[in-house]
């Protein structure tokens, strides 16, 4: 996994620029090594996912995505199959507005909009 992770590092770091400063690359490495996060590499992109257990649902959250959109979207069915095998009933994702159209084409619905107010 470390070779793939290093190869995917530029895409992960680029995606982290939009994460609001919640994580850095070393946090992703730690999460992957602990098994809390999952890496989905493609030749020209990757996803990082996490399973979130809510009181009523278990979902697979697409935490980070970067690289060529087509290759990322090509993994869609494989990610769903894996999520189902883990007992998840949905995929979730927060992202930039540019994700709206390609996700809609794959059956995703926009559920809400996130807002942030940072303070000291």
Regions found by a protein language model. Name each.
Residues 33-70:
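Conserved donor-binding loop and adjoining core beta-sheet/short helix segment
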Residues 8, 46, 53, 88-89:
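Generic recognition of cysteine residues
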Residues 1-23:
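Short amphipathic alpha-helix that is part of the acyltransferase structural core
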Residues 37, 105-108:
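Short glycine-aromatic motifs
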Residues 41-45, 85-88, 109:
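Short glycine/proline-enriched coil/turn segments at helix->beta-strand junctions
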